[in-house]
C-alpha cells in the first residue's frame, strides 16, 4: 500500500523510538530463528557469505518473511540497481522516510528503520540529479582525481605519527580519511578537530536504515549528524565570503550567478562526511585485512604501489563496504520471474551478488589483476543515490591510503583477529585490528 503524502513527522520521543527499534529488532530475531536467511543477515550472524548462498539458492528473487523481496543473483542485482523504477523512497511520500509511529505489525515495513530527521539517505530523484550536476565538475568520476595530491599529503601526515603498533581503524583508517576529507573540502581548523569523533558517532548511519541501533546510539548518531551539518554550513558560509583552496569553494563556483542554492554544497559536504567517510574507512580497513591475508597480492602492491587503485576495486568487490542495498519500487517492476507492485521493499545482497559464479570467474579469490570493463562500477557504489554520489571521492581517498602504506610500511603485519562492530549487517564495519610495522 503506498505511503500517504503527509507533513514531516515530529521527532519521536524516546519511548516511541525505543519501542519501534525493539519491535523491528524482534522481527529479525523471530524470523531468523524460523530460518529466514535475510532475517539472519540482519541479526548479524557471522557467516554472512553462506547466508548469501542460501538466499541465491532460493531463486533469483524471493520474498522474505520480513515482507522484503531479496536477491543475491548477480545479474538481477545489477539490473535492480540500474532500474529507474527503483529508488530509496516510497513513491507517494514526501519528506523524511520514517515509520516510527506506524504499527509495523500492520504495515510490515522494516525499511527506513531509524529516523535521521532529514533525507540524507533517501534523496528524491530530482535532488540526486541536482547534486550529481553540482558534484560532476569538482568531485565527479572524471574530475575527482584532481584532489589526489591533497588526499595523499593528508594520509602521509597520519603515517608520520603512527607508533610501531597501532589499530587499523582508530589509528589509521579513520584519521587518514578524516584528514584527507578535511584537506579536499578545505575545512577550517574547528571542523578538522571535531571530525574524527563525529565520524565515529555517525558510523552507524548506513546500518541504521535496516538494523535498529540501541536507543543511546541512535540519539548520539542523529546529534552528531546535526553537528556535521552545522560545521559544513559554517564552512560553506566562510567560503562564500572568502573563497579559498578546496572543493567547497570549487563547488560554490559551479554555475556562478545561476541561482544555485548554497545549501546543495552543504548537503554535498555532509554526504561526503557521513556517507563517504564511513564507506572509505570500511574500504581501507577491509583492504588492509584482505591484503595481509593474501601475501601474494600484498607483494604485488608493495612491488608496484601504483596498483593501489586495483586493490581498492577488488576490495569493493570481494569485501564491499556496503553489503545490503535497500530499494523501493516506484512502479510495477517485472524481474526474476516476479511482478512487483509499486511501493515494495527490495534488498540486494551485494556481497553475495558480487561473488555470483555466473558473474565472476573464481569469485571467492581476492586478486588485484581481475579484469574490469572501462566504466565499470561495483554494486556497493552503483546508482544515482547517496552512495553513487560519494563514490569518486571514496575511491581517491582509499587509493591514497593503500598507496602510502605500500610505499612506507611494506613490513606491515596483523596481530590477532579483527573485530567488527555489532548491529552492522549493512556495512559489516571493522571495529579493531592491531597492526605492527616492522
Curated annotation (Swiss-Prot):
Pfam families the record matches: p450 (PF00067)
Coiled coil: none
GO terms, biological process: antibiotic biosynthetic process
InterPro entries associated with the record: Cyt_P450, Cyt_P450_B, Cyt_P450_sf, P450-rel_GT_act
GO MF term list: monooxygenase activity; oxidoreductase activity, acting on paired donors, with incorporation or reduction of molecular oxygen
KW Transcription (keyword) present: no
CDD domains per the UniProt record, alphabetical: AknT-like
Keyword tags: Antibiotic biosynthesis
Domain of life: Bacteria
Protein family: Belongs to the cytochrome P450 family.
NCBIfam families for this protein: P450_rel_GT_act (TIGR04515)
PANTHER family (UniProt xref): CYTOCHROME P450 YJIB-RELATED (PTHR46696:SF1), P450, PUTATIVE (EUROFUNG)-RELATED (PTHR46696)
Protein's name according to its UniProt entry: Anthracycline biosynthesis protein DnrQ
Source species: Streptomyces peucetius
Lineage: Bacteria, Bacillati, Actinomycetota, Actinomycetes, Kitasatosporales
